[in-house]
Amino acid sequence: AGDQNLFTSLYPTLSQQLPREPMEWRRSYGRAPKMIHLESNFVQFKEELLPKEGNKALLTFPFLHIYWTECCDTEVYKTTVKDDITKWQNVLKAHNSVDWLIVVVESDAKKKNKTNILPRTSIVDKIRNDFCNKQSDRCVVLSDPLKDSSRSQESWNAFLTKLRTLLLMSFTKNLGKFEDDMRTLREKRTEPGWSFCEYFMVQELAFVFEMLQQFEALIVQYDELDALFSPYVVNFGAGGKC
């Protein structure tokens, strides 16, 4: 969300560098941590992409929402950007989407063309006061990301680390909820009307592990599907109903 042209200018570098550094992935239930590389698909913000009530799918909605701005003008912030962020956050809240990040891009070239500006820290402080409450880390500053300087590189690396961390946190949380839903569904398999087709959604979990190159976990998911489905095949072959 936010300044689409700004994001477009940064996207090639972002998509290339985000997966380069591995992240330690710690899961629940005492499972050993794994080192993974995060590859993300960035899509333009649309309300119809947000999760709907009762939708248990894992890969059909965005995990982390990012608002991009390079606003450094007092009046522009008051009259445009603040209202835009408010509307964006209200839509997220309506869909219980709580994982977000506001990126304020600092551009020396843009500041030189403006006269009615606040110091960069003041703009960031305003955004944090208006929207972040106790989550001040949800607003980050990116200093001249397209400029070849040590300051810009340091800022860019810090941003990538923050983005990887938030992506992994959101992914782990959503994955855990999905696993809990599937676990609850599996435990009801002896009840009348239980649907294997609905449970077959767990294959989506296998797709996730494949993308993360966690092949042992992938095999476990397919073995579990096979163990549950085989009795249905045997029962059907004996003249029963699936």
Regions found by a protein language model. Give the residues of each.
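Eukaryotic intrinsically disordered, low-complexity segments enriched for acidic and Ser/Thr/Pro residues
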Residues: 1-200, 235-242
